[in-house]
Amino acid sequence: MSNKIINLGSIEIANDKPFVLFGGMNVLESRDLAMSIAETYAEVTQKLGIPYVFKASFDKANRSSINSYRGPGMEEGLKIFEEIKKTFNLPLITDVHEVHQCAPVAEVVDIIQLPAFLARQTDLVVAMAKTGTIINVKKPQFLAPHEMRHIITKFNEAGNDEIILCERGSSFGYNNLVVDMLGMDEMKQSGYPVIFDATHALQRPGGRADSAGGRRAQAAELARSGMALGLAGLFIEAHPDPDNAKCDGPCALPLHQLENYLKQMKAIDDLVKSFDPIDTSK
């Protein structure tokens, strides 16, 4: 199958196009922090010439503890998204968890994300598909790469072919994730754009007493490996103070390192996509 191109305004999302950054913060902690982080991303990506989509969640519905911070909720979250979009002229991506969220969220954001833990929930898939919005499907930690075809088929049969596939690691025993680089390449064979969530792939699920741990010190190494595959995009989360982030701080890139980090990712992407393809199957 040839590479599918998804058009998001002037941005082309495809495996053989320059990579698109899907980046921001894990969860909306406050309006002011979200605006500040969005401004930093916007400035850095514009400087480096990287197509960019702002990401944040309005509700983290799958936290380890019932007492953990979840976010401002949909109504307040959409107000913040609207302000970010208007102020910085950025396209937006966020996740939904329930059927009733799909339509109102799709009115504000440009891409809606299907969470990994919910990727087989047919009612949610159908509701997302019917919005006509671009969909980012997080590959569940418990599915093989080739099994993503079933989720793709559900979206297709519900009337939506604007699909991005996102790798975020696979379960490896207890409290651990690994990234199968060949698995990402296998997903690319579908023709749909594949992006790499290099933040959540660093998780240690349940690695803390009441929250997920992570391996922030290896954020660059893992992302470099993924970018060497020639992907449609990179998905990352950053925070000005990761140790005090309200969610997934152990995986978050320190915001002050964003520019140097992205310089390396762009250099790898440019190099890999300058090569002629090699068909080693023959």
From Swiss-Prot:
Domain of life: Bacteria
One record GO biological process: keto-3-deoxy-D-manno-octulosonic acid biosynthetic process
Key words, A-Z: Cytoplasm, Lipopolysaccharide biosynthesis, Transferase
Enzyme nomenclature, EC number: 2.5.1.55
Gene Ontology CC annotation, any one: cytoplasm
Pfam families: DAHP_synth_1
Catalytic activity: D-arabinose 5-phosphate + phosphoenolpyruvate + H2O = 3-deoxy-alpha-D-manno-2-octulosonate-8-phosphate + phosphate
Pathway the protein takes part in: Carbohydrate biosynthesis; 3-deoxy-D-manno-octulosonate biosynthesis; 3-deoxy-D-manno-octulosonate from D-ribulose 5-phosphate: step 2/3; Bacterial outer membrane biogenesis; lipopolysaccharide biosynthesis
Enzyme class, spelled out: transferase
Subcellular location(s) per record: Cytoplasm
GO molecular function: 3-deoxy-8-phosphooctulonate synthase activity
SUPFAM superfamilies: Aldolase
Disulfide pairings: none
Similarity section: Belongs to the KdsA family.
Protein name per UniProt: 2-dehydro-3-deoxyphosphooctonate aldolase
Name of the encoding gene: kdsA
